[in-house]
C-alpha cells in the first residue's frame, strides 16, 4: 500500500469494538472511517467510496441488512464489498446477509480483529 491508503468503513454502534477494529486496521496500513449508525454509514459510503465496508447488523436508525440492501441498490456503492460483522449468528441471518450481497459474514464472538483483517485483505487481493 505504497501511496494512497486503502479505505475501510466500519459501521457499528459499539464504539469500543469499532475502536479495536479501527486500531488493528490502521496498524496494518489501512485508512479507517467510522460510522455509528446505519444512516451515517450510508452517508459515509457515498461520500468516501471505501474499498471495503465492515457492517454491523443491530444498530440504531437503520439496521445492517437495510444498509446492505441500499448499498447494493445504488450504482455508486453496489460494487463495494461488504463484510457483515455482527453478533447475530443464526443460520437465517447469515443466509440473509449473503443473499443480500455481503461477501462474508463474521460473527464477532468467533473472530479476532486480526482474522477479520486477513479476510479483508483476501477479498481485496492484498498481500
Language model segments and positions:
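Non-catalytic signal-transmission and effector/linker regions of two-component phosphorelay proteins
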Residues: 1-7, 114-127
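Conserved acidic segment of CheY-like receiver
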Residues: 4-16, 21-25, 53
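Active-site beta3 strand of CheY-like receiver
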Residues: 48-54
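Active-site residues of response regulator receiver
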Residues: 56, 86
Amino acid at each position: 500500500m505504497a501511496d494512497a491508503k486503502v479505505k475501510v468503513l466500519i459501521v457499528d454502534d459499539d464504539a469500543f469494538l469499532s475502536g479495536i477494529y479501527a486500531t488493528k486496521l490502521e496498524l496494518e496500513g489501512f485508512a479507517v472511517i467510522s460510522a455509528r449508525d446505519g444512516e451515517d454509514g450510508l452517508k459515509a459510503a457515498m461520500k468516501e467510496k471505501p474499498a471495503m465496508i465492515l457492517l454491523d447488523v443491530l444498530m440504531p436508525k437503520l439496521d445492517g441488512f437495510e444498509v446492505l440492501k441500499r448499498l447494493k441498490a445504488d450504482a455508486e456503492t453496489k460494487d463495494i464489498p461488504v463484510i457483515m460483522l455482527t453478533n447475530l449468528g443464526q443460520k437465517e441471518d447469515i443466509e440473509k446477509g449473503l443473499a443480500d450481497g455481503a461477501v462474508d459474514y463474521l460473527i464477532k464472538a468467533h473472530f479476532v480483529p486480526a482474522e477479520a483483517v486477513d479476510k479483508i485483505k483476501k477479498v481485496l487481493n492484498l498481500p
